[in-house]
């Protein structure tokens, strides 16, 4: 089964907790702090495996949770870092955030890796907080929570050649006779509803990968007939082979078919207009094909390649394969990892956005309580051990140093008012 799009949930591992411990050794009366740091939590990493061709594995498992780092130990021994969770994906996989629709990774080459959810760092043990004023601190840090997010995996096939055209023009039949692929073939529209790949070898021993893409119809660039799902696979082909029913057996005009499909390609991605294209005039064994072909060529520019074939009688198939192989040799390698944002008119690579750590916001709940939120303060909250009074006092000092106390006063917060951070509730004290 071919699966080219799926939504999954990721949870990176939390960092291990640091611990509060002291050196207890005979004849060492003031041994000092000896609490070790926690280990780093495992990250969720995606890696390209060129042996994969589909996202089928993610259809049956949608939730992935990486391991937590080990807690620190006494004698200043650090906890072990957790081993990253590596998820294998096929070449051509794009990973997007469900929340922001931002591209987090674009994986093209075999072995290429991307960290999508980072594991939390380990909490610090009490020996890390020793100072001349406080040589034996009696608090430590909890591990940092690992990142958690939902992502969409989208597969854009990496094929040398993409077959496009209206339904029932002979794309699947062509793939079946030039490769060992076994696509479903039927005398009705949309027999092919998922792309099929085949390795093609020419009589002069050149080879390339050909993708049989589901049939397109007018309006495909707007999503008609699942057009977006089909068109995205065209983006990463080096050469487009445009198949046309030159007999007009479906009651359509071959020239109109050609113009409609090309317009849909351009509407979907403007840069597809410049992609090398070979026109295959199929069904030349049927009546009216020769006359239609002559009229068709008269309407085209001289530099457009048109190859007449019959996938039923197999006439001129070898010549078509030679033409495709020659065209591929002319085409330079295309860097598919850089996507062009046509709305902005610039080339850019999108990386994951890391929010500013210092900003925070203050709002009011319905009951009048003040709610403080922000990446840095929430991270500190999660890493504070609220069972330890010294750790709580340290958290209060951090809030003051960030300017949160002053900001609360400016918002009208006074002695005894309730302040909330995530699931915690505090009383404001002047």
UniProtKB/Swiss-Prot annotation:
NCBIfam families named in the record: Obg_CgtA (TIGR02729), Obg_CgtA_exten (TIGR03595), PRK12296.1 (NF008954), PRK12297.1 (NF008955), PRK12299.1 (NF008956)
Residues annotated for GTP binding in this entry: 165-172, 190-194, 212-215, 282-285, 310-312
Complexes and interactors: Monomer.
Xref: Pfam families: DUF1967, GTP1_OBG, MMR_HSR1
Domain (OCT) ranges: 352-430
Species assigned in the record: Staphylococcus epidermidis (strain ATCC 12228 / FDA PCI 1200)
Keyword Magnesium part of the UniProt annotation: yes
HAMAP family for this protein: GTPase_Obg
Keywords, comma-separated and alphabetical: Cytoplasm, GTP-binding, Hydrolase, Magnesium, Metal-binding, Nucleotide-binding
Protein name as it appears in the record: GTPase Obg
């Amino acid at each position: 089964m071919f699966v080219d799009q799926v939504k999954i949930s990721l949870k990176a591992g939390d960092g291990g907790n640091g611990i509060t411990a002291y050196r207890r050794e005979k004849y060492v009366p003031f041994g000092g702090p000896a609490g070790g740091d926690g280990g780093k939590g495992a990250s969720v990493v995606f890696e390209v495996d060129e042996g994969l061709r589909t996202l089928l594995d993610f259809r049956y498992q949608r939730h992935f949770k990486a391991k937590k780092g080990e807690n620190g130990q006494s004698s200043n021994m650090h906890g072990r870092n957790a081993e990253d969770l590596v998820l294998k994906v096929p070449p051509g996989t794009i990973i997007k955030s469900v929340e922001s629709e931002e591209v987090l990774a674009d994986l093209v080459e075999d072995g290429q890796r991307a960290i999508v959810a980072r594991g939390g760092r380990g909490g610090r043990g009490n020996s890390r907080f020793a100072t001349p004023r406080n040589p034996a601190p009696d608090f430590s840090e909890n591990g940092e929570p690992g990142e958690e997010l939902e992502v969409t995996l989208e597969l854009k096939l990496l094929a040398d050649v993409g077959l496009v055209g209206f339904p029932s023009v002979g794309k699947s039949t062509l793939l079946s006779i030039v490769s060992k692929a076994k696509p479903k073939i039927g005398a009705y529209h949309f027999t092919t509803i998922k792309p099929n790949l085949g390795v093609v070898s020419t009589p002069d021993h050149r080879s390339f990968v050909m993708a049989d893409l589901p049939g397109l119809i007018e309006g495909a660039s707007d999503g008609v007939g699942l057009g977006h799902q089909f068109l995205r696979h065209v983006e990463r082909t080096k050469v487009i082979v445009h198949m046309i029913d030159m007999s007009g057996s479906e009651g359509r005009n071959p020239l109109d078919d050609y113009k409609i499909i090309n317009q849909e390609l351009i509407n979907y991605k403007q840069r597809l207009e410049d992609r090398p294209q070979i026109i295959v005039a199929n069904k030349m064994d049927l009546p009216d094909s020769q006359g239609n072909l002559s009229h068709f060529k008269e309407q085209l520019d001289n530099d457009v390649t048109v190859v007449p074939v019959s996938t039923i009688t197999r006439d001129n198939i070898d010549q078509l394969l030679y033409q495709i192989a020659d065209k591929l040799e002319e085409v330079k390698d295309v860097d598919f990892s850089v996507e062009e944002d046509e709305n902005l008119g610039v080339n850019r690579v999108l990386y994951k956005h890391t929010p500013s750590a210092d900003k925070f916001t203050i709002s009011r709940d319905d009951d009048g309580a003040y709610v403080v939120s922000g990446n840095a303060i929430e991270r500190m909250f999660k890493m504070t051990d609220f069972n330890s009074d010294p750790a709580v006092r340290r958290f209060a000092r951090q809030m003051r140093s960030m300017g949160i106390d002053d900001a609360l006063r400016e918002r009208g917060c006074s002695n005894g008012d309730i302040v909330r951070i995530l699931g915690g509730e505090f009383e404001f004290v002047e």
